[in-house]
């Protein structure tokens, strides 16, 4: 940064402190990652100046010939990555991508079947405090109380009973592979559309280390950050028959001008995801998650569903008589960032919770491997088994610092 320190030292200071925080702490929040310098450079480019309402070749402003190139690159790269017939890269977020699908196929009050938020779903899958739960009649499905795996018999039974117009698959805190073929089978049985929200697993899908929902779903939504390792934003993939409706739902339906600098960053990230080294990265993300899960179990922690198939895991802290809120706070004090998270059938409120959610996408980007997963689990065990012990916390801080110094981040 050459201009910001002089132009606005207060904003620069806050950004610099955040850069130092990201370097000094171990990032285990499952929805976060570290983008490349190229992605950041694209997002900070002159494209931030350009208004471009509409779509490539059909804009409502002049001077769009170069941003058209950028948006076409993003769309074509996404099609290639996921095997989609049509892609819209303009959604500002995953929530707006979901909203656009709802506006495409639903009317106010229509019935939708979605995953219970406390069982691993998302706010936009029907939470009563979200527009989705306010605008539509959401019926919830969840996980088996014993296995904590999606109960597909329950999904089928509720689909038959309520005859939803749309079924939503996908989650924000579900550590197992979702059977997309089973969901499509159920949707076809009751005449429903199927939407898959793959925001958390998109990078794993792109790399071929997780099943691809595109062949099964009428609509697939995603964020472009998380495991896809791009800028914060959204994207919709759909069958060609819905292309015009989806594009119209985004613009002029729920958005005006697209963020062309962000779309440029999406194009860069999608280009990165097409490379062989991204496939290696995604494979390591899953390997690290499985290793971390096993190491935490060796430390005596209980994992929801007994482990993980993707990049995230949920830890049930009730055996340790801890809340997620307490664990999040004390781990942050030693330099490990996680988030408190509800677990299935959680007796605590969403502001307290009985669990924490942990992900390996960011630490894998940083270069952490299997040995580091063992050490992270040991540090978490040290801290959560000795809450209130300053000696234990100080030891944990030193061990965290040793790891972060070994794998520097954004230091040049």
Swiss-Prot record:
GO terms for biological process: glycine biosynthetic process from serine; tetrahydrofolate interconversion. It catalyses: (6R)-5,10-methylene-5,6,7,8-tetrahydrofolate + glycine + H2O = (6S)-5,6,7,8-tetrahydrofolate + L-serine. GO terms for molecular function: glycine hydroxymethyltransferase activity; pyridoxal phosphate binding. This is Serine hydroxymethyltransferase. It is found in: Cytoplasm. Homodimer. GO terms for cellular component: cytosol. Pathway: One-carbon metabolism; tetrahydrofolate interconversion; Amino-acid biosynthesis; glycine biosynthesis; glycine from L-serine: step 1/1. It comes from Geobacillus kaustophilus (strain HTA426). Its cofactor is pyridoxal 5'-phosphate. HAMAP family: SHMT. Belongs to the SHMT family. The modification N6-(pyridoxal phosphate)lysine is found at residue 226.
């Amino acid at each position: 940064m050459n201009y910001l320190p002089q132009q606005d030292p207060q904003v620069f200071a806050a950004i610099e402190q955040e850069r130092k925080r990201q370097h000094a702490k171990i990032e285990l929040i499952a929805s976060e990652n570290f983008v490349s310098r190229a992605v950041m450079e694209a997002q900070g480019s002159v494209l931030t100046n350009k208004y471009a309402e509409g779509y490539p070749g059909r804009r409502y402003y002049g001077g769009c010939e170069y941003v058209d190139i950028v948006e076409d690159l993003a769309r074509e790269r996404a099609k290639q990555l996921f095997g989609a017939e049509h892609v819209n890269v303009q959604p500002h977020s995953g929530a707006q991508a979901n909203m656009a699908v709802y506006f495409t196929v639903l009317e106010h009050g229509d019935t939708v079947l979605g995953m219970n938020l406390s069982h691993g779903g998302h706010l936009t899958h029907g939470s009563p405090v979200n527009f989705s739960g306010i605008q539509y009649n959401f019926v919830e499905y969840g996980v088996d109380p014993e296995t904590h795996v999606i109960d597909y018999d329950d999904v089928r039974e509720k689909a038959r009973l309520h005859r939803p117009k749309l079924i939503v698959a996908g989650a924000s805190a579900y550590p197992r592979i979702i059977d997309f073929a089973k969901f499509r089978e159920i949707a076809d049985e009751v005449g429903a559309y199927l939407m898959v929200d793959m925001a958390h697993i998109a990078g794993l899908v792109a790399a071929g280390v997780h099943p691809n929902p595109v062949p099964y779903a009428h609509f697939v939504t995603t964020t472009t950050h998380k495991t896809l390792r791009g800028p914060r934003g959204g994207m919709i993939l759909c069958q060609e028959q819905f292309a015009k409706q989806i594009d119209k739902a985004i613009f002029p339906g729920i958005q005006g001008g697209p963020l062309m600098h962000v779309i440029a960053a999406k194009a860069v990230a999608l280009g990165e995801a097409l490379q062989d080294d991204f496939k290696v990265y995604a494979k390591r993300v899953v390997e690290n998650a499985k290793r971390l899960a096993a190491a935490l179990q060796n430390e005596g922690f209980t994992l929801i569903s007994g482990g993980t198939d993707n990049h995230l895991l949920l830890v049930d802290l009730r055996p340790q008589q801890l809340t997620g809120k307490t664990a999040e706070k004390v781990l942050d004090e030693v330099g490990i960032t996680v988030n408190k998270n509800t677990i299935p059938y959680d007796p605590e409120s969403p502001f307290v919770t009985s669990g924490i959610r942990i992900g390996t996408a960011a630490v894998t980007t940083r270069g952490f491997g299997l040995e580091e997963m063992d050490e992270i689990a040991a540090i978490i065990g040290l801290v959560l088994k000795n809450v209130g012990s300053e000696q234990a916390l100080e030891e944990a801080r030193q061990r965290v610092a040793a790891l972060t110094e070994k794998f520097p981040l954004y230091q040049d």
